[in-house]
């Protein structure tokens, strides 16, 4: 995915405010052996790009003043209540160095699983992304989680899924194996009141009939 930017010569709070007022977004590019570079981008183009899933988990071609470089989106700040991108950070990547990146999970085949079709189970997505490590060329836009064989009362764990070639999970604890999704039967609804007639309540002051001796 291509991103167009221009080098920014003026910095500071006032300069950034004027930049935003002119329809631009300030940003920075850092990493590798090159010095950090402050940039500016067209706000509307950036705003729409941020709505695309691939923009967050892919290697991007950042073109600055006509020169392209490979980068990852590392951070961005939004206005608290306006649809306004305040700032964005990109990190340069090297083709020979592995990157750590959080990639989205795409869940498939839930509707065709026996747990859902035959037992009426409900599938819950516990996680929506995973952190992986790989070379930039191997970075997937997403990781697929196949739910076809999920069983009621059980879950699909991170180590259960097949990752693309060259991609490994980043687990911060060796024994870590988080649940990605599980299947459960919904709780039975409370029983509805029966329609059987009930005896009328006794009138105030009325005595209950006595048994005959």
From Swiss-Prot:
Residues 191-213 are annotated as: Disordered. InterPro entries: Rbsml_bL25/Gln-tRNA_synth_N (IPR020056), Ribosomal_bL25/Gln-tRNA_synth (IPR011035), Ribosomal_bL25_b-dom (IPR020057), Ribosomal_bL25_C (IPR037121), Ribosomal_bL25_long (IPR001021), Ribosomal_bL25_short (IPR020055), Ribosomal_L25_dom (IPR029751), Ribosomal_uL5_bac-type (IPR020930). One of its GO terms (biological process) is translation. Signal peptide: none annotated. It comes from the Bacteria. One of its GO terms (cellular component) is cytosolic large ribosomal subunit. The keyword Membrane does not apply. The keyword S-adenosyl-L-methionine does not apply. Pfam families: Ribosomal_L25p, Ribosomal_TL5_C. GO terms for molecular function: 5S rRNA binding; structural constituent of ribosome. Residues 191-207 have a biased composition (Low complexity). Keywords: Ribonucleoprotein, Ribosomal protein, RNA-binding, rRNA-binding. This is one of the proteins that binds to the 5S RNA in the ribosome where it forms part of the central protuberance. Belongs to the bacterial ribosomal protein bL25 family. CTC subfamily. Part of the 50S ribosomal subunit; part of the 5S rRNA/L5/L18/L25 subcomplex. Contacts the 5S rRNA. Binds to the 5S rRNA independently of L5 and L18. This is Large ribosomal subunit protein bL25. It comes from Polynucleobacter asymbioticus (strain DSM 18221 / CIP 109841 / QLW-P1DMWA-1).
């Amino acid at each position: 995915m291509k991103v167009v930017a221009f080098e920014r010569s003026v910095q500071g709070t006032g300069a950034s405010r004027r930049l935003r007022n002119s329809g631009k977004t300030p940003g920075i590019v850092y990493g590798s052996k090159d010095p950090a570079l402050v940039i500016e981008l067209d706000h509307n183009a950036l705003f729409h790009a941020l709505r695309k899933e691939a923009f967050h988990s892919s290697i991007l071609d950042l073109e600055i003043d006509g020169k392209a470089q490979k980068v990852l989106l590392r951070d961005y700040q939004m206005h608290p209540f306006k649809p306004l991108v305040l700032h964005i950070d990109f990190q340069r990547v090297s083709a020979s160095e592995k990157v750590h990146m959080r990639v989205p999970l795409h869940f498939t085949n839930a509707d065709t699983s026996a747990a859902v079709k035959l037992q009426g189970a409900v599938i819950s997505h516990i996680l929506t992304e995973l952190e992986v490590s790989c070379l930039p060329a191997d970075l997937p836009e997403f990781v697929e989680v196949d739910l076809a064989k999920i069983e009621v009362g059980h879950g699909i764990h991170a180590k259960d899924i097949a990752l693309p070639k060259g991609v490994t999970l980043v687990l911060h604890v060796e024994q870590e194996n988080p649940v990605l999704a599980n299947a459960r039967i919904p709780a039975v609804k409370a029983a509805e009141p029966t329609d059987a007639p009930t005896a009328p309540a006794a009138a105030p002051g009325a005595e209950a009939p006595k048994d005959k001796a």
